[in-house]
Amino acid sequence: MESQQLSQHSHISHGSACASVTSKEVHTNQDPLDVSASKTEECEKASTKANSQQTTTPASSAVPENPHHASPQTAQSHSPQNGPYPQQCMMTQNQANPSGWSFYGHPSMIPYTPYQMSPMYFPPGPQSQFPQYPSSVGTPLSTPSPESGNTFTDSSSADSDMTSTKKYVRPPPMLTSPNDFPNWVKTYIKFLQNSNLGGIIPTVNGKPVRQITDDELTFLYNTFQIFAPSQFLPTWVKDILSVDYTDIMKILSKSIEKMQSDTQEANDIVTLANLQYNGSTPADAFETKVTNIIDRLNNNGIHINNKVACQLIMRGLSGEYKFLRYTRHRHLNMTVAELFLDIHAIYEEQQGSRNSKPNYRRNPSDEKNDSRSYTNTTKPKVIARNPQKTNNSKSKTARAHNVSTSNNSPSTDNDSISKSTTEPIQLNNKHDLHLRPETY
């Protein structure tokens, strides 16, 4: 009777599946098919736990006529919690949840190849400039799970596909705090460079080397969304995304500017701590250099007060400026401007003393005139020989005249002659030479 009732209801109802499920006789009597149905429900519960890494069939898949005869594999593929994969490029926030990567344990353990996140991001065609994603990583939802009996692609073949272009690229870690964003963005930029996307990263002037494509922008958005959850982003990043949620390039540009600012701050502190001044450069240039460093640090939130600044400046003074360490160290309220007044005073005094010393070069015409009026000590033979010859000739003439007069004079005796020959002869010349007769 029960089999006849079921056959009658099958012709009236819309389908045998609906009649067999809604019939009370099925529940009151123990049908052998109930055992397979209970197993099917257990398989459905087990499949909901594995749906985080497994995929579902497309919406166009055929529905079996009788669910009692449906296999466990078919029930797993049609999980009530997961529908067809949305055909869109943007990933949802649930995909960024680490629990969604139960097969790998954590997103950081997923082996990434250069510039790939999902096969749908790559332009179609055999001449794609980006390597395709292997079947073992980033599989679509239609792929059955390992528990269903089907295994993934062989690891050796997957390795050959992924290493044909480049080795695995390690993804950046998950951002867990807004304070860690400066360090995280450095690893994210490194990840883009290893993924053959270094040309789209902004340079020092804020412009990339080349124009970013739509596929690259999609990859940039999805990777940033996965590894940098919105609840852990800094306020300034959220402000940029509130205007345009896809403007990741602006976030990278601002981050690079902040990195350069941090590097400049470190360089300014090192420069200020190693100041050296001895007057070799103008005092104005030294003051401008120091004040600019202090102003930059103060504007960036690193406050340098007058006491610390004066101590750093005085520690680098040397030469005549060194005594300022001892004359100014007792003034507690001394400012940087007052210290530079003393430095300027010493520098101007040095410049004045240098200008007072004659350091001009004499003209050659002046040297010739001086050689004519003054005796040149470097050439004594040229200057002293000619006058000596003239004086000698004069002395011989005078001596002969004296001898002749002495012989002709009757009052002159031998004593006077001997006296005149023994006494030196006085010659009226400008050299005042004393000559003896014996020498001639």
Swiss-Prot record:
<feature type="compositionally biased region" description="Low complexity">
    <location>
        <begin position="153"/>
        <end position="165"/>
    </location>
</feature>
<keyword id="KW-0597">Phosphoprotein</keyword>
<dbReference type="GO" id="GO:0005737">
    <property type="term" value="C:cytoplasm"/>
</dbReference>
<feature type="compositionally biased region" description="Low complexity">
    <location>
        <begin position="402"/>
        <end position="418"/>
    </location>
</feature>
<dbReference type="GO" id="GO:0003723">
    <property type="term" value="F:RNA binding"/>
</dbReference>
<dbReference type="Pfam" id="PF01021">
    <property type="entry name" value="TYA"/>
</dbReference>
<keyword id="KW-0694">RNA-binding</keyword>
<feature type="site" description="Cleavage; by Ty1 protease">
    <location>
        <begin position="401"/>
        <end position="402"/>
    </location>
</feature>
<feature type="compositionally biased region" description="Polar residues">
    <location>
        <begin position="127"/>
        <end position="152"/>
    </location>
</feature>
<protein>
    <recommendedName>
        <fullName>Transposon Ty1-JR2 Gag polyprotein</fullName>
    </recommendedName>
</protein>
<feature type="region of interest" description="Disordered">
    <location>
        <begin position="126"/>
        <end position="173"/>
    </location>
</feature>
<feature type="compositionally biased region" description="Low complexity">
    <location>
        <begin position="1"/>
        <end position="16"/>
    </location>
</feature>
<feature type="region of interest" description="Disordered">
    <location>
        <begin position="1"/>
        <end position="93"/>
    </location>
</feature>
<comment type="subunit">
    <text>Homotrimer.</text>
</comment>
<feature type="region of interest" description="RNA-binding">
    <location>
        <begin position="299"/>
        <end position="401"/>
    </location>
</feature>
<feature type="compositionally biased region" description="Polar residues">
    <location>
        <begin position="48"/>
        <end position="60"/>
    </location>
</feature>
<comment type="function">
    <text>Capsid protein (CA) is the structural component of the virus-like particle (VLP), forming the shell that encapsulates the retrotransposons dimeric RNA genome. The particles are assembled from trimer-clustered units and there are holes in the capsid shells that allow for the diffusion of macromolecules. CA also has nucleocapsid-like chaperone activity, promoting primer tRNA(i)-Met annealing to the multipartite primer-binding site (PBS), dimerization of Ty1 RNA and initiation of reverse transcription.</text>
</comment>
<feature type="region of interest" description="Disordered">
    <location>
        <begin position="352"/>
        <end position="440"/>
    </location>
</feature>
<keyword id="KW-0814">Transposable element</keyword>
<feature type="compositionally biased region" description="Polar residues">
    <location>
        <begin position="71"/>
        <end position="93"/>
    </location>
</feature>
<feature type="compositionally biased region" description="Polar residues">
    <location>
        <begin position="419"/>
        <end position="428"/>
    </location>
</feature>
<feature type="modified residue" description="Phosphoserine">
    <location>
        <position position="416"/>
    </location>
</feature>
<feature type="compositionally biased region" description="Basic and acidic residues">
    <location>
        <begin position="429"/>
        <end position="440"/>
    </location>
</feature>
<keyword id="KW-0963">Cytoplasm</keyword>
<dbReference type="GO" id="GO:0075523">
    <property type="term" value="P:viral translational frameshifting"/>
</dbReference>
<dbReference type="InterPro" id="IPR015820">
    <property type="entry name" value="TYA"/>
</dbReference>
